[in-house]
C-alpha cells in the first residue's frame, strides 16, 4: 500500500502588494534625508562644542551655529536629491 503522507501544498498567492517604483524611491530618499540630517546636525554640534570649549570660552552660540550649518547642509542635499529623483521619474514617463 502506498500511503502518501506528504500532500502537495498549494502556495498561497502573495497578499503583500508591492509599492510603486516612485513611492519606494521617495521613501528611500526621505530615509536618506532624515539620516543625513541627524548625522550632519550631530557633527555640527560636536564641532561647535569643541570650538566653544577651545576657542570661545564655553559660550553656547558656536554649538547652535554648528547645528544650524549641519542642518542647512543636510537640507540642501535633500532638496537636490528629491529634485533629481523627480527629474528621473519624469524622464521615465
UniProtKB/Swiss-Prot annotation:
Keywords: Membrane, Mitochondrion, Mitochondrion inner membrane, Transmembrane, Transmembrane helix
Main localization of the protein described in the UniProt heading: mitochondrion
Localization per Swiss-Prot or TrEMBL: Mitochondrion inner membrane
Entries under Pfam families matching the protein: DUF543
Regions that span the bilayer: 34-56
Residues in the Mitochondrial intermembrane compartment per record: 57-93
Membrane topology: Single-pass membrane protein
GO biological process: cristae formation
Subunit composition and interactions: Component of the mitochondrial contact site and cristae organizing system (MICOS) complex.
Function: Component of the MICOS complex, a large protein complex of the mitochondrial inner membrane that plays crucial roles in the maintenance of crista junctions, inner membrane architecture, and formation of contact sites to the outer membrane.
Protein name: MICOS complex subunit mic10
Organism from which the protein derives: Neurospora crassa (strain ATCC 24698 / 74-OR23-1A / CBS 708.71 / DSM 1257 / FGSC 987)
Primary gene name: mic10
Amino acid at each position: 500500500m502506498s500511503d502518501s503522507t506528504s500532500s502537495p501544498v498549494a502556495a498561497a498567492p502573495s497578499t503583500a502588494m508591492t509599492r510603486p517604483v516612485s513611492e519606494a524611491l521617495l521613501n528611500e530618499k526621505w530615509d536618506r534625508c532624515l539620516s543625513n540630517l541627524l548625522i550632519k546636525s550631530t557633527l555640527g554640534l560636536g564641532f561647535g562644542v569643541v570650538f566653544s570649549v577651545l576657542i570661545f570660552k564655553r559660550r553656547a552660540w558656536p554649538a547652535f551655529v554648528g547645528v544650524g550649518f549641519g542642518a542647512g547642509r543636510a537640507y540642501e542635499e535633500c532638496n537636490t536629491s528629491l529634485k533629481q529623483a523627480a527629474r528621473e521619474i519624469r524622464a521615465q514617463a
